[in-house]
Amino acid sequence: MTMPLSVTVCQKIDQAIAKYPAGREQSAVMAALTIVQSERGWLSPESLRDVAAYLNMPPVAVYEVASFYSMYHLKPVGRYVLTLCTNLPCLLQGADKAARHLQEALNIGWSETTADGMFTLLQGECMGACQEAPVLLTNHHRMCCKMTPPQIDALLAQLRAEAAGKERDE
């Protein structure tokens, strides 16, 4: 069972709602989903119901949005979501090698999470940086370009060190 939406989340959703005309709070559904996922890590059925109630929407309508977009996670994911572009331009520049290396280094397949909950590996569609192929996104925000096995190893080490530092700070 999840907690109700936090005060901070409600304030952020209210800021998103304020961008739309009065009575159009449902227009903020994508922003609300992003905000809730940012706090909770993923969108559980309870989270979807919370968003639906807050925006006065049918829960199925919120689910339809969340299930349509790949940036929303309807099951738990790792602390770091690694999305590798597997479209043709990236494949021609070595995304297949990058994929194999990631899967071997993490000991997981596509759409799986490492046993320690640190990484989830996803296939992605074109990210609009074909000239920088192969491209990998971390947590849907940071774009890493020209990802060779050594660069992948460095990225994984950096993310592990970052996570260890955050755990010490907590």
Feature-to-residue mapping (PLM):
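Signature of N-terminal electron-transfer/Fe-S-associated modules in redox systems
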Residues: 1-170
